[in-house]
Every structure is written in C-alpha cells, then in structure tokens.
Amino acid sequence: MDGLLVLADGTVFRGQGFGAKGTAIGEVVFNTGMSGYQEVITDPSYTGQLITFTYPELGNTGVNQEDLEADTPAVKAVLCRCLAPQPSNWRSSGTLEQWLEQHGVVGLKGIDTRAVVRQLRDGGAINGAVSTDGTSPAELLKQVLAAPSMAGQNLAERVSTTRAYRWSSPTAAAFDRRLQDQPVDRYRVVAIDFGIKRAILERLSAHGCDVEVLPAGSDADAVLALKPDGVFLSNGPGDPSAVGSGIALAKQLLSDPALPMFGICLGHQILGLALGGSTFKLGYGHRGLNHPCGGSGLVEITSQNHGFALDANSLDPQRVAVTHHNLNDRTVAGLELRDQPVFGVQYHPEASPGPHDADHHFARFINLMASRRNADKIERLS
C-alpha cells in the first residue's frame, strides 16, 4: 500500500506503508543510532512522535520480548529507508512489520530519509502526518496544522504508571556480571515514573537497589512514607516545564538537605526547574547513541533522547554546578548541588541501546546513599 509523510510546511514525501493501516499525527524527529530500534520504539520518551531512523536498514534482527522498554510501542509511526522482510537473529520471535501491525503503529518505508533528516536538521522538528489509508495530502496538512506543538504538553502523566508497585526484574539484563558476584548492601529507592524505561529499573536493581515505583503525580508524603534511602526521577516525554506535579514534588524533596536524589533526562530537567532554572526547546533534539559529553576531565559517549534542555544561565551558580556539557552544542548535560547529595544527567547511563560509558552514575547514586546511611549510624551512636 502507498503511503505519505506530510510535514507542517507542506512538504510531501511518498513511500510504501507497512505495519498498521491508518494515519498518525505528531512531532517528526530522527534517531541516528545504527542499532537498538526495538528499544527506541518502546521508549516512553518518544510518546507522541513519528520517528525517522537515519540508518538505512531496519528490522534485520526482528523483535523479541527481552529488549522491550515498555509493554507496547511508544511512537506513533516509524519511518525508514529499507525494511528487512525476513529477520535473522536467534532471539527473534517475529518481524518488526508484524509487531507494529499488532500494536497499531503505522509505518512508512522506501522514503528518502536523508532528505527528511536534512529538512528537520535545517528547519527543526515540526509536526507531520504519516498516512497509509488513502487520505489526501491536503486533508493531512489540515490535520497537521491543527495538531498541538510538543511545547507545553505534559505527556509524563499520560504514560506514567497509575499505581505504585515494587520492581521485580523479569530478565537478567545486567551487562556487568561483576555486580552479580559482589555482596552488596541493598538500598530502598523510590523511583518517580515520568515514563521510566525498564533498563533503568534493571540497572538500579543490579547496583543493589530495591525499587518502589510511584506515579508521576505522587506527593512528598507518599514518597517519604516509604522511608527511602534515595529518590530517583525518571526519563519521560513532553515538555518538562509542563510537568507541574513533578516540579512541585522535587521542590518538596529538596527541602531535606540529606536526601540523595538522582535524575535522568526529564528527571534531570525537573531537578533544574525545581531549583529555579528554565528549559528551552532544541531545534531538532538529541536522539542517538554517540553523543559526546564532557565533565571533570572525562568524555563519555552517551545515548540521548530529548527535545528540551536546561538553560545554563538560569541556574544559580552559588547552589548549582553544571558538571557536564554536550560537546556537540555545549548544552547542559549534567548538574549537581554544591551542598546536597543531588545530581542529574541529561543522557541515559543505562544505555539500552547505546554505550556503557556512563554506567558509573548509578554507582555514584549508591555511594551517596551509603554515605547517608553511615552518617545516620554515627549520629545514632553519638
């Protein structure tokens, strides 16, 4: 079946449809990773978006149950140059096309993805429509122009869990086997789910955390009632400045000067907003597996997926230290409080997909919780 991509500026790209038949409208973005398409498609941070893969081949390894970051795809549509008709991988349980059709996700193949990406790079991420049901370009453009911008949208509460639960890992996805052989103290961590990836939960667990997951709209009383050793603020989709409940929660928790806190991606931005900072929308975002980030004399190659960033000039330098920058455009990639055990990174140390350079941030979180526990013991003995 024939298909179309219609952008808000009126540009039309033609290709062949796959997956579910229908129309999807959302923000058109691109990911530059050469692998990990299943993790990307199921990452809740992509909610509401039409994802263009720059690597020309897609679907070569099929799909499986182990590489899901959520139960279902988060993206509204998938765009690619070439789709593999037959996967080749020992873990594959089906084709990407069948899986997308099963979950109602529209796909478009055979389009000039290089031209799409150049247009997004030069003009910025914009709304668009992918259609495989015969809807005319004129009608699609009308629907696209009526669709809301990603700016101002609180998507975190839409994708967050609706109930509290304790994480129990169904897979053995910890890539560092040394962690499994070491005796570790267990730490109780409360994770606020703004769209959390399973890989993050697995890395926290592998590093010695018993994780209690709470909905995005939780208040400080619900968090502190669980007597956490530390609090984790997760990744998630949408505009961070629109997540009012999350910002309010972070402000409340920051009033405890001894409570360790760690934020990733959206959670990092929420920390910055709670500290009086502001965010802005990036032109076309950072979405890929090889973004260099520098800080403290160390360069990490990182996995990233975000369309907003903290404004460094909005942060109080007397209280907040910017610890990392994205070395491609110098945007803020990490922060820490000078007088509290609180820090965040804009990228994904859990990878999935991507490099493992930044996994040490989980160990840092553990060390902060261990220091607090030891300080409490000394105080009780004195």
UniProtKB/Swiss-Prot annotation:
SMART domains per UniProt: CPSase_sm_chain
Pfam family, one: GATase
All residue ranges annotated as the Glutamine amidotransferase type-1 domain in the record: 188-375
Key words of the record: Amino-acid biosynthesis, Arginine biosynthesis, ATP-binding, Glutamine amidotransferase, Ligase, Nucleotide-binding, Pyrimidine biosynthesis
InterPro entries per UniProt: Anth_synth/Amidotransfase, CarbamoylP_synth_ssu, CarbamoylP_synth_ssu_N, CarbP_synth_ssu_N_sf, Class_I_gatase-like, CPSase_GATase1, GATASE
UniProt EC number: 6.3.5.5
Catalytic activity: hydrogencarbonate + L-glutamine + 2 ATP + H2O = carbamoyl phosphate + L-glutamate + 2 ADP + phosphate + 2 H(+)
Catalytic residues (positions): C265 (nucleophile), H348, E350
Presence of keyword Magnesium: no
GO molecular function annotations of the record: ATP binding; carbamoyl-phosphate synthase (glutamine-hydrolyzing) activity; glutaminase activity
Residues engaged in binding L-glutamine: S45, G236, G238, L266, Q269, N305, G307, F308
Record bears the keyword RNA-binding: no
UniProt cross-references to CDD domains, sorted A to Z: GATase1_CPSase
GO annotation (BP), single: glutamine metabolic process
Annotated PROSITE patterns: GATASE_TYPE_1 (PS51273)
Pathway assigned to this chain's UniProt record: Amino-acid biosynthesis; L-arginine biosynthesis; carbamoyl phosphate from bicarbonate: step 1/1; Pyrimidine metabolism; UMP biosynthesis via de novo pathway; (S)-dihydroorotate from bicarbonate: step 1/3
Ranges for region CPSase: 1-184
Subunit structure: Composed of two chains; the small (or glutamine) chain promotes the hydrolysis of glutamine to ammonia, which is used by the large (or ammonia) chain to synthesize carbamoyl phosphate. Tetramer of heterodimers (alpha,beta)4.
Role summary: Small subunit of the glutamine-dependent carbamoyl phosphate synthetase (CPSase). CPSase catalyzes the formation of carbamoyl phosphate from the ammonia moiety of glutamine, carbonate, and phosphate donated by ATP, constituting the first step of 2 biosynthetic pathways, one leading to arginine and/or urea and the other to pyrimidine nucleotides. The small subunit (glutamine amidotransferase) binds and cleaves glutamine to supply the large subunit with the substrate ammonia.
PANTHER family, alphabetized: CARBAMOYL-PHOSPHATE SYNTHASE SMALL CHAIN, MULTIFUNCTIONAL TRYPTOPHAN BIOSYNTHESIS PROTEIN-RELATED
HAMAP family xrefs: CPSase_S_chain
Family per record: Belongs to the CarA family.
Protein name per the record: Carbamoyl phosphate synthase small chain
Source species: Synechococcus sp. (strain RCC307)
